[in-house]
């Protein structure tokens, strides 16, 4: 199950994808949010408060998502 939270950076953890797929998903999310970010240690980071947008995008792709920490 993926968890998303925000503290100036939107973090997506627990994505059941390999590294290459994770990087591709990170690029999709960053482009959709018009923001920078990175993928490291299995966590997608998108700069800024994009929790709602990221959740919608992931749910539209069939992922189970929950918001963590607020």
What residue spans do the PLM features occupy?
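Short, small-residue-biased leader/transition segments that mark boundaries at the very start
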Residues: 2-4
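Gly-rich Lys/Arg/Thr-decorated short loops/hinges at beta-loop-alpha junctions or inter-strand turns
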Residues: 8
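Charged, surface-exposed interaction regions in soluble eukaryotic proteins
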Residues: 11, 16-45, 52
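Short, Lys/Arg-rich amphipathic alpha-helical interaction segments
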Residues: 41, 48-70
């Amino acid at each position: 199950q993926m968890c998303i939270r925000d503290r100036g950076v939107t973090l997506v953890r627990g994505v059941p994808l390999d590294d290459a797929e994770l990087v591709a998903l990170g690029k999709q999310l960053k482009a959709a949010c018009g923001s920078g970010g990175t993928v490291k240690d299995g966590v997608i980071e998108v700069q800024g408060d994009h929790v709602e947008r990221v959740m919608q995008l992931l749910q539209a792709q069939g992922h189970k998502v929950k918001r963590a920490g607020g």
